[in-house]
Amino acid sequence: MGREINQRKAAIIGCGFVGSATAFTLMQSQLFSELVLVDVDFDKADGEAKDIAHGIPFAGQMKIHAGTYEDLSDAAIIIVTAGAGQKPGETRLDLVHKNVAIYESIIPRIAEQNKDAILLIVSNPVDILTYTALKLSGYPENRVLGSGTVLDTARLKYALGEHLSVDS
């Protein structure tokens, strides 16, 4: 802590499907000059970083690399995608106990390194995990954001459109 925040640096915690897709999207967006990928499996994060880096010549300039929690100290935004995958027949609420346990191990480590970043929570169930991250991090409320329920809204609109035979 005590380092100046780099407003053009982002970090992603969790390099599964969502984390990797988020990293690729951020690389294409050119919003950041540096992106750090952190995962419990460093080699996985390193492989994802290298794969995405190969697309940089077509998108602009960005430094993308695997890192550790220490690399979060100057990140402006930390996106948390880590969590257990949802199994067939399992509801998002079934994920609560698994993902809260995961958050209990990672959120304090994030907060140790950086108290000034914005935390963007993406893992499901996002509302409960956003609250969990808020409590575990000690961050002020305006610095812990959840990705919301846009996907749920899209699914509902689609289902209603199908049921009513109208465009969604």
Each language-model region and where it sits:
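N-terminal Rossmann-fold NAD(P) dinucleotide-binding loop
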Residues: G19-S20
